[in-house]
Amino acid sequence: MSALIEGLPDAVAIRCLARVPYYLFPKLEVICRSWREAVHSTELYKAREELKSSENLLCVCAFDPENVWQLYDPTRDLWITLPVLPSKVRNLAHFGVVSTSRKLFVLGGGSDAVDPLTGDQDGSFATNEVWAYDPVVRQWAQRAPMIVPRAMFACCVVNGKILVAGGFTTCRKSISKAEIYDPDNDVWVSIPDLHYSHNSACTGLVIGGEVHVVHKGLTTVQVLTKDGWRVHEHSWLQGPMTVVNGSLYVMSHGLIYKQDRESRKVVISASGFKRRIGFAMMGFRDEIYVIGGVIGPEGWNSDIKKMSDVDVLTLGNEKPVWQKAASMTRCRGTILGCVELKI
């Protein structure tokens, strides 16, 4: 690699490039071959961490367009489109998504797609495939598959490892199986099953360092402690949930609540989202993001409106307020996955 910046040692030049925001990296790499090599080097990302210039971006995938992910840069209020996820499954949905080891992971899921000519189902309901997006090389790569194919399951990161539990397998049968993945060694290992499965989708939340598996429609929560799974009766509100700074927030009946173990308090009205379905509610930094979704037909209007809107609830202020962020530039409609990624 030739000198990055004339007159400067490469070690110093790398630290200069490390301060450039991620969205400009595609422009940096066309300057010259040595800059391209630097942009795709792990040394640059190590320097970003040392200089505290790493960026936390929001990753979003929607039903439309197919298998496309976008990154949101909150500092500059702009969206970046990633290369298309190269899965053979059309309209991949019902998957798990997390980030760890500075990579975006998309796990399992399947497709309800139907061939428009024959009417036959065009995909598998549940797969065991695992994809990782590496922002250093800006490419997707397949990783070791899960032991059990699954869709609509709980998926979390604990101590840098990915835990999956519950959901439905290929025959649409609910399962209680759980497993954990080591991204450094690309290995899956089975862990004790959940105490029960349920004929509904489940989601996973990390609260107080512990995984909580929540089934839609149930008041009980399964919590993974150092002694194994425990069943807790929490009577939490039903609705979209997210965690911000260790606290659980729920949108229910047109309101945002801060939910403690046995009590809750109203944070702010969310009546503007009553007609919207299929959106994501995501804790990001000190804020709650409500992203995308669709507005269904009403009255004589039979149209379905696919949304690309992004609404942000700022919690750090004495009085929480709703604000608008830049709309997604490619993705729109039902949100299939949403997670934070540190680059």
Predicted feature residues:
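Kelch-like beta-propeller repeat domains
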Residues: 1-343
